[in-house]
Design a protein with these regions (language model features):
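Cyclophilin-like peptidyl-prolyl cis-trans isomerases
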Residues: 1-117
């Protein structure tokens, strides 16, 4: 999490609720391989936007994603957008954050979500 900017989730390797690995959380993968970037310059990265996370290199997207807590026009054309949060964004504003380089001992988790067409 970057306070007041974004919340990141989706580390299926090291971020599982029942098997957290604080040393590597945020660096894991899904085990299914990466996908190519699908950059859409017309997508407005506004508060509530959801996009796939990646390494510094493009075409390395996997299971991790982020949700913006504020507008971020610098992300346009840089990250693969997948949608927008239409309900519940206020809950993400309450996600625990630690100002130090320490992990929150009891992190918050996304237990359920629903994708709408």
């Amino acid at each position: 999490m970057i306070k007041n900017v974004l919340v990141q989730a989706g580390d299926l390797e090291f971020g599982k609720k029942n098997n957290l690995n604080y040393t590597y959380i945020g660096t894991g993968s899904s085990g299914y391989g990466t996908i190519n970037s699908e950059l859409d310059n017309s997508f407005d990265f506004k508060k509530g936007s959801v996009a796939l996370s990646r390494t510094e290199k493009k075409n390395t997207e996997d299971s991790q994603f982020f949700i913006l807590l504020a507008d971020a026009p610098l992300f346009e054309g840089e990250y693969s957008p997948v949608g927008k949060v239409i309900y519940g964004l206020e809950v993400l504003q309450k996600v625990k954050y630690n100002d130090k380089v320490e992990y929150v001992l009891r992190p918050d988790f996304i237990n359920t979500f629903e994708m709408l067409k």
